[in-house]
């Protein structure tokens, strides 16, 4: 770290001079010379720039404060990375680093040129940035003007000049484009360059459409990002998350394309089917109109006479005339209909024909792939999809609800949340990277500080100074204000004038700091909130007076509290506490509001009183925590919010510039009265509202208008950009930030803060109550004793028991609050008592349970078997019952007790029997199913009604019997201590009461009817019987406390907005309405309620003073309004009423109060985005906590172990496959070679893509030629795919069907052929277009084969597959909730008036229709339209209306029941179940991503076994050791070990079995360890995985390794060592012998004795040199035999034949040395 230390003193900051530049040039030359000389340049230390010294960042504190004269001056670069490059830095105010290129700018201006230095000074000056920022903001203001003044052109020139000046300064100071850090090297400057270029281009050249070019000016707003440093970071994060989204986007587009193709095939042309008036002429003709097979009249005409031609002409004109279509009230599109049995039907005298254009200006349809894709995209984003759902079901039939269920659950929930998961993960990764970087910096700085300390310690003179000054400096550093302020504060803000004043302060302090005062203030806050919430419209004068007085009292209390606290604490210390500042602001605002109470328009100040509610956070930990989370998120979201604001601004201006004029010119296309609609882009504010609405997820409605007035292309582009950039990315990042604020630590941290004042006060009260209770009980006992002078054993025992209870109560209550150490004797006695009690209890429990005849309880206890305990009934009653009624405790060993015990045992055996349980489940399902038949048509089907009545009795009796049996079997104690049994008990009670009332003839009573409704809860009994649902319910129940807490906090948040709404809008949503024309009166005719009432009294019966059903007249209905706004359903009507509102009881005027839109914008941000997303955060966090409690596998594993575990988990489930053998037949062999080539698969994939394209080209009502061409193309594709199928079957034979994808291909081909052959037959003989269309869907199956080739998509689909079991359980629970609510709906809303969204198809009349409605509401879609008719009151409905075929009268709903019904369902399904869905997808996506990012993934193991097949064709699981090198080289990365790999493979130490073979598992384990890095702790895991492999592969040969590769190598090395040693020994002998022979020959026969005279070596030597001694000794001696043995051993050692001794003994080098 020493090298990173900054230089000390004047060395730190050095001016950049010509000599500095020369030094850099010299360094560069040295570097280049080294390169030329091929010397390595030592760049390892500084291979990249220091992150702390990046341009734009402040100088690290470690470098110290630069001298003032060196600011804004060129300095030498401090970053070691740049010290050998031509750069210099400039430090501006705040020590911000700016880096420049040291080359001459524009080839003219050197770094030392005064002009360039001046430009640099301007550029880095903080005022210059501020000036540019101000210019941009001013320019933005001018851009928002829809009708700019005449002088704006001049201002535009000024802006252009300023931007040009800025660019010039940048170019002069930095250079243009050559070299580092020049103007164009920064991508953000490209933006400036483009903006300026476009400005000049539009001025100098006439380019036609100026409005399009003017929109480029809006990009100037992006310049704010370049000016504010933090924004660059957040934009970088956004770009990163978009990159990560690539795979998710591809999958989304692919799935949408598939769904769009399905929609195209199923619903093509359906949405053009309308109800057309039957012409009067036709009724007189003999045409069989309704039986026409083609559905319209033209095909029925015969002959060519003129009359028919005229008729034909008139008929065409008639059916294409929109006036002849049937329209519902208030609808601009005609009523759709269908020809299938479950589709929508037309009213009388209307017929269903396919004519005219599609709904919504013709933009909602499935007639071509493009429109189908748009429809499905809309469905996926859930925007106004209820409209598409209703239109499609009305035209095609209710059966197709299945299509929407699949798309909503797979498309909408999965894909949209997958995008959320990806963004959240990208954010989390970035967070981790930032934290890691911060940690690294911290470590670096610590090292630097240590080094600096050492350096300073060397200077002895500084030591004392440091000791004295350090603490003082530390304190001074934390003083934010100048010293004069502290002097002022000490004099004026600390009141310590005299001792009596200080005494008063102490007294006041004791009062105001007392916990009871805090409790009192909290109660006052709650009461004040209740008082504010009681405000409503209309209010009596007395009630208004009461509220006013209450407000004065509370304001007085809070003012008094503030004043007393200020006196007690002194202002200086009072304002140090955040909560006190908050209090003081609210109190001040309340006092100001009282002063300005009568000033018109300032009633909004009353809303500040609502902020008092937040004071509850002081004593409510959850509220405090959630406010902190929101606070933290808002802090982190500061930059993100700014980016969002910039995006909204840019798109609003773009929209205004591109489409504003068109809205004005073509307004008649979208508005009947040719006035601008509420949603338009003619001015900036309305354009902003549209963009905000798109960010809320509502885009399709306004896009239709845009497309109608401005053309389709531009509108689609702009809207899709807003949707993708704004909605999907920014809002998801927003949610990711919110989720990241949640953690278990966050929630747990609250417990560590200790008790607050409120808890202390409550605990004191509890203790006081407990003491009082004890005292009263004790005195009552004494009183009773004195009154009754009977002291028998029973009363003594009773008294002891009471005393014990009192003592127990006392100990419990005191123990709760004080932890007192217990003495040993005390604790022992307590324990022994407890043991005795348990023993007594156990013995009686055994006695009653076992019904044994054995008298001795101890013997009984010893003999009891655990299995028997579980199979015997429990105690019948609880402990208290036995103590109060001793007669209940009967002897079960004899007499009646024994009989009783046997009966209970028999009951127990029955209820524990699986058949009994199955029977009950079957009865529950039957009884639930029976409820579905009780619809409005039941009266017409008397047989079904009678069957249901008898069935109801049977079910009730069965369930009563079951309940009684369980009472007998389990006993009351066990039965009623189980929550599920309680549920059963209550449901059976309801059925029993209902049945009794029916028998007694009271079934028509209102109370009994309501009770009968509760039978809908019967299906809940299924919960305890189905494991999957029970798991989900248990998880939910675990999360209930957290969810309830958040719900409560949301209600508090919403309460503030609701009260504010009541203050702003109470009584202002009413209007005078003309029933005849269905329009509001104009303000000029009727100004207020008084004038409207006068009109009504003047006998105008069609006039009514109406109020909006959902309004802000009180807090309760205000909550409903907010729920509609938060779910974006029905919010338009509320907003329109708000912006049109004037005064109480005044007639509204169009957009008179337009800025009230901002109330809703603020609520949506805080009330919807934040609070509703908190639910997701809480649920995910709660699941993580539950998982931690359960102790999931991964909690006890390190990251390294987790990697091993994942790899081994995948590895253990694999086994080597036997490859498909190549056929011996030559022809089959050729086909086999063809179909197994990769190019063949690629070719088929290309064909599938082409096939998909041809399917996309299909449109409704296409020409005959096009139809024929597409038909034959389809035939060609079917032929090709059939050929592929046949070829593969020929080549692979029976093995073809062993591969899943092949089976899928085969099924698709068969279906395609059937579709082709049966199409004509079906169309001709069975008029069922549905069946025909479904068969055509088989072609889409081919497209799914593309998934096989895409790895990235496979990961995402793997996440879905992992989620499926859990999602299925949630789906079951959701279905159960829907089922129960459907039955409730049928009971309560079956006869509601048909209006809004309740009509002949979507209603609660039948079970099927109810389910359709509830499926729609599951995503909160259209619930406002279903609630609206239910909230009708007379005269909007008729309570006495007779409903044919039933005794039920009236068509009015029940508003209270309706609101509770829909609110409960939305909270349960939308907020809980759907959010659980999201939580599971996020969880599993993380797991899947971890798995895919693991060093080894599934594909790597597949690749291993695919390669193995080639080396082990018989699937023996072994290969020869000699093949190992080739095998490892053939593998792909990361498992591959490329050649030369011999040494590497030896080091793997692979076990060898007889025959020099190695097992596949051993190789794979070794290669896995090689990739992951070997570790000792993994040995056990490896053993486990081997066992798993053995279990998965019973065919695996059990083997005992005889050696290993490493051991084999060691043996070979040892053998070589022995060989060398022996060779050396033989060489020495040979040399001695050769030497002797040479001397003997040169010097004659000497007298010296030969070194060796016997042995094989000597013999061979003599033969070689022709020694005579050889011939003299013809017989072989004993030594020769020994020599022969020597030879054999030597041959073994050398493994070579003994041809020539010298060659045998010596290698080449030895031979040469010997010669």
UniProtKB/Swiss-Prot annotation:
Q: Which residues lie within the membrane without crossing it?
A: 369-393, 684-704, 1116-1137, 1407-1429
Q: Kindly give the Pfam families that the UniProt entry links to this protein.
A: Ion_trans, IQ_SCN5A_C, Na_trans_assoc
Please give the catalytic activity noted in the UniProt record.
Na(+)(in) = Na(+)(out)
Gene Ontology terms describing biological process:
membrane depolarization during action potential; neuronal action potential
Q: Which gene encodes it?
A: scn4ab
Establish whether keyword Transmembrane helix is in the entry: yes
Transmembrane segment boundaries: 127-145, 153-173, 188-205, 212-228, 248-267, 401-421, 516-534, 546-565, 580-599, 602-619, 636-654, 716-734, 916-933, 947-965, 980-998, 1007-1025, 1043-1062, 1155-1176, 1240-1257, 1269-1287, 1300-1317, 1331-1347, 1367-1384, 1459-1481
Which cysteines form disulfides? 275-337, 346-352, 668-674, 706-715, 1072-1092, 1437-1452
Q: Which GO terms describe its cellular component?
A: voltage-gated sodium channel complex
Positions on the Extracellular side per record topology: 146-152, 206-211, 268-368, 394-400, 535-545, 600-601, 655-683, 705-715, 934-946, 999-1006, 1063-1115, 1138-1154, 1258-1268, 1318-1330, 1385-1406, 1430-1458
**Which species does this protein come from?**
Tetraodon nigroviridis (Spotted green pufferfish)
For this entry, the protein name equals Sodium channel protein type 4 subunit alpha B
């Amino acid at each position: 770290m020493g090298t990173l230390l900054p230089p000390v003193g004047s060395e730190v900051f050095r001016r950049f001079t010509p000599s500095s530049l020369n030094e850099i040039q010299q360094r560069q030359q040295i570097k280049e010379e080294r390169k030329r000389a091929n010397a390595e340049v030592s760049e390892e230390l500084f291979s990249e720039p220091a992150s702390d010294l990046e341009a734009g960042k402040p100088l690290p504190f470690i470098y110290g404060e630069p001298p003032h004269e060196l600011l804004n001056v060129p300095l030498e670069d401090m970053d070691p990375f740049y010290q050998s490059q031509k750069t210099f830095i400039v430090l501006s105010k705040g020590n911000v680093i700016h880096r420049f290129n040291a080359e001459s700018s524009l080839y003219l201006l050197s770094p030392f040129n005064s002009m360039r230095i001046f430009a640099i000074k301007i550029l880095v000056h903080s005022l210059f940035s501020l000036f540019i920022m101000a210019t941009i903001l001013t320019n933005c203001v001018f851009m928002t003007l829809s009708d700019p003044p005449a002088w704006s052109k001049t201002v535009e020139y000024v802006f252009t000049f300023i931007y040009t000046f800025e660019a010039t300064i940048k170019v002069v100071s930095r250079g243009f484009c050559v070299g580092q850090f020049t103007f164009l090297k920064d991508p953000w400057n490209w933006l400036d360059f483009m903006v300026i270029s476009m400005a000049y281009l539009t001025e100098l050249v006439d380019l036609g459409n100026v409005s399009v070019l003017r929109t480029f000016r809006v990009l100037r707003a992006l310049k704010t990002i370049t000016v504010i440093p933090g924004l660059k970071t957040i934009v970088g994060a956004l770009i990163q998350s978009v990159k990560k989204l690539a795979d998710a986007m591809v999958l989304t587009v692919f799935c949408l394309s598939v769904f769009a193709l399905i929609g195209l095939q199923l619903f093509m042309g359906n949405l053009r089917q309308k109800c057309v008036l039957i012409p009067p002429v036709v009724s007189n003709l003999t045409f069989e109109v309704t039986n026409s097979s083609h559905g319209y009249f033209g095909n029925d005409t015969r002959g060519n006479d003129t009359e028919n031609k005229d008729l034909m002409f008139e008929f065409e004109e008639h059916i294409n005339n929109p006036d002849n279509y049937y329209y519902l009230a208030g609808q601009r599109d005609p009523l759709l209909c269908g020809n299938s049995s479950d589709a929508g039907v037309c009213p009388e005298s209307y017929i269903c024909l396919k004519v005219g254009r599609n709904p919504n200006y013709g933009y909602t349809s499935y007639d071509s792939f493009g429109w189908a894709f748009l429809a499905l995209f809309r469905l996926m984003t859930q925007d106004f999809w209820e409209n598409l759902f209703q239109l499609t079901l009305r035209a095609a039939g209710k059966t197709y609800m299945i299509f929407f269920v699949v798309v909503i659950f797979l498309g909408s929930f999965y894909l949209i949340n997958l995008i959320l998961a990806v963004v959240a993960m990208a954010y989390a990764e970035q967070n981790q990277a930032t934290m890691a970087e911060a940690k690294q910096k911290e470590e670096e700085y610590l090292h630097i500080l240590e080094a600096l300390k050492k350096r300073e310690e060397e200077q002895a003179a500084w030591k004392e100074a440091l000791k004295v000054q350090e603490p003082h400096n530390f304190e001074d550093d934390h003083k934010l204000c100048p010293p004069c302020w502290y002097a002022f504060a000490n004099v004026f803000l600390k009141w310590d004038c005299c001792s009596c004043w200080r005494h008063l302060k102490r007294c006041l302090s004791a009062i105001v700091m007392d916990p009871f005062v805090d409790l009192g203030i909290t109660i006052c806050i709650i009461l004040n909130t209740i008082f504010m919430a009681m405000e409503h419209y209309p209010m009596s004068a007395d009630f208004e007076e009461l509220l006013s007085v209450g407000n004065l009292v509370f304001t007085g209390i809070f003012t008094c509290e503030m004043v007393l606290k200020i006196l007690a604490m002194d202002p200086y210390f009072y304002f140090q506490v955040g909560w006190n500042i908050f209090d003081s602001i609210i109190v001040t605002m309340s006092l100001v509001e009282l002063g300005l109470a009568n000033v018109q328009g300032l009633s909004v100040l009353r809303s500040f009183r609502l902020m008092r509610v937040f004071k509850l956070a002081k004593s409510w930990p959850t509220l405090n925590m959630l406010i902190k989370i929101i606070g933290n998120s808002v802090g982190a979201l500061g930059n993100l919010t700014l980016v969002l604001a910039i995006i909204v601004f840019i798109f609003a201006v773009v929209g205004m510039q591109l489409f504003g004029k068109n809205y004005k010119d073509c307004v008649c296309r979208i508005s009947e009265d040719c006035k601008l609609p509420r949603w338009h882009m003619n001015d900036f504010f309305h354009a902003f509202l549209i963009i905000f609405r798109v960010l809320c997820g509502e885009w399709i409605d306004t896009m239709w208008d845009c497309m109608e007035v401005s053309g389709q292309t531009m509108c689609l582009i702009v809207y899709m950009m807003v949707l993708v950039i704004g909605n999907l990315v920014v809002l998801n990042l927003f949610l990711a930030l919110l989720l990241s604020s949640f953690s278990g630590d966050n929630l747990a941290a609250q417990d560590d803060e200790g008790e607050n004042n409120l808890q202390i006060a409550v605990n004191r009260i509890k203790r006081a109550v407990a003491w009082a209770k004890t005292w009263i009980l004790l005195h009552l006992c004494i009183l009773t004793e004195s009154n009754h002078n009977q002291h028998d054993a029973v009363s003594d025992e009773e008294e002891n028991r009471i005393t014990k209870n009192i003592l127990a109560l006392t100990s419990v209550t005191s123990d709760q609050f004080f932890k007192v150490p217990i003495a040993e004797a005390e604790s022992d006695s307590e324990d022994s008592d407890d043991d005795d009690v348990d023993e007594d209890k156990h013995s009686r429990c055994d006695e009653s349970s076992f019904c044994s005849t054995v008298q001795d309880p101890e013997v009984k206890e010893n003999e009891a078997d655990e299995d028997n305990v579980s199979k015997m009934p429990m105690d019948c009653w609880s402990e208290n019952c036995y103590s109060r009624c001793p007669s209940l405790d009967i002897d079960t060993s004899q007499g009646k007790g024994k009989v009783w015990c046997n009966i209970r045992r028999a009951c127990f055996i029955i209820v524990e029997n699986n058949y009994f349980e199955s029977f009950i489940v079957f009865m529950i399902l039957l009884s639930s199913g029976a409820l579905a038949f009780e619809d409005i048509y039941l009266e017409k089907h008397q047989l079904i009604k009678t069957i249901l009545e008898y069935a109801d009795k049977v079910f009730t009796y069965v369930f009563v019997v079951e309940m009684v049996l369980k009472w007998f079997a389990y006993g009351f104690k066990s039965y009623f201590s189980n929550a599920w049994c309680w549920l059963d008990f209550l449901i059976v009670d309801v059925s029993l009461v209902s049945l009794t009332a029916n028998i007694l003839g009271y079934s028509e009573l209102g109370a009994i009817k309501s009770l009968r409704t509760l039978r809908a809860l019967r299906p809940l009994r299924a919960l305890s019987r189905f494991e999957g649902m029970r798991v989900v319910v248990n998880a939910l129940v675990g999360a209930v406390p957290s969810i309830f807490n958040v719900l409560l906090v949301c209600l508090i948040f919403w309460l503030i907005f609701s009260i504010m709404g009541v203050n702003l809008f109470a009584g202002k949503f009413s209007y005078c309405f003309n029933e005849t024309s269905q329009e509001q009166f104009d303000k000029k005719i009727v100004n207020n309620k008084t004038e409207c009432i006068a009109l009504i009294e003047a006998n105008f019966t069609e006039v009514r003073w109406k109020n909006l059903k959902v309004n802000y007249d009180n807090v309760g209905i205000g909550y409903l309004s907010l729920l509609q706004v938060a779910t974006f359903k029905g919010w338009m009507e509320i907003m329109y009423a708000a912006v049109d509102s004037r005064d109480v009881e005044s007639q509204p005027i169009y957009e008179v109060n337009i800025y009230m839109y901002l109330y809703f914008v603020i609520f949506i941000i805080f009330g919807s985005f934040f609070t509703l997303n908190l639910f997701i955060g809480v649920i995910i966090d709660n699941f993580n906590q539950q998982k931690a409690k359960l102790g999931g596998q991964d909690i006890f594993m390190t990251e390294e172990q987790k990697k091993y575990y994942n790899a081994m988990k995948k590895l253990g489930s694999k086994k080597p496959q036997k490859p498909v053998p190549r056929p011996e037949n030559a022809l089959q062999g050729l086909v086999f070679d063809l179909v197994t080539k990769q190019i063949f698969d690629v070719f088929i994939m290309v064909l599938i893509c082409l096939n998909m394209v041809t399917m996309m080209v299909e449109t409704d009502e296409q020409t005959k030629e096009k139809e024929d061409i597409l038909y034959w193309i389809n035939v060609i594709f079917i032929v090709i795919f059939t050929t592929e199928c046949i070829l593969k079957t020929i080549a692979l034979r029976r093995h073809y069907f062993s591969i899943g994808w092949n089976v899928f291909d085969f099924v698709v081909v068969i279906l395609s052929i059937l579709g082709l052959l049966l199409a004509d037959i079906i169309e001709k003989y069975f008029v069922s277009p549905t069946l025909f269309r479904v068969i055509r869907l088989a072609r889409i199956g081919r497209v799914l084969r593309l998934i096989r080739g895409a790895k990235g998509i496979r990961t995402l689909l793997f996440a879905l597959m992992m989620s499926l079991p859990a999602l299925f359980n949630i789906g079951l629970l959701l279905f159960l909730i829907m089922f129960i609510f459907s039955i409730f709906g049928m009971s309560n809303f079956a006869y509601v008036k048909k209006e809004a969204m309740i009509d002949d198809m979507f209603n609660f009349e039948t079970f099927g229709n109810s389910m359709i409605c509830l499926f729609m509401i599951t995503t909160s879609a259209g619930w406002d339209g279903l609630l609206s008719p239910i909230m009708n009151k007379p005269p909007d409905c008729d309570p006495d209306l007779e409903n044919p075929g039933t005794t039920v009268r009236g068509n009015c709903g029940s508003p209270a029941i309706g609101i509770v019904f829909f609110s409960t369902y939305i909270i349960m399904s939308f907020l809980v179940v759907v959010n659980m869905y999201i939580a599971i997808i996020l969880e599993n996506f993380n797991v899947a991503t971890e798995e895919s990012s693991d060093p080894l993934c599934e594909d790597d193991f597949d690749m291993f076994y695919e390669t193995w097949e080639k080396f082990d064709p018989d699937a023996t699981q072994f290969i020869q050791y000699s093949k190992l090198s080739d095998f490892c080289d053939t593998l792909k990365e990361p498992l591959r070990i490329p050649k030369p790999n011999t040494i590497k493979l030896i080091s793997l130490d692979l076990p060898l079995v007889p025959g020099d073979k190695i097992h596949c598992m051993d190789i794979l384990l070794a290669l896995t360890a090689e990739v992951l890095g070997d570790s000792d702790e993994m040995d056990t895991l490896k053993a486990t995985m081997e066992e798993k492999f053995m279990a998965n592969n019973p065919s695996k040969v059990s083997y005992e390794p005889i050696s290993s590769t490493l051991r084999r190598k060691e043996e070979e090395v040892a053998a070589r060592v022995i060989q060398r040693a022996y060779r050396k020994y033989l060489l020495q002998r040979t040399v001695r012998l050769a030497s002797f022979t040479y001397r003997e020959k040169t010097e004659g026969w000497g007298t010296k004795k030969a070194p060796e005279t016997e042995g094989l070596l000597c013999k061979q030597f003599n033969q070689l040199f022709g020694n005579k001694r050889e011939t003299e000794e013809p017989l072989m001696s004993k030594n020769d035999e020994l020599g022969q043995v020597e030879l054999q051993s030597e041959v073994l050692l050398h493994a070579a034949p003994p041809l020539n001794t010298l060659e045998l003994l010596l290698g080449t080098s030895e031979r040469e040395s010997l010669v």
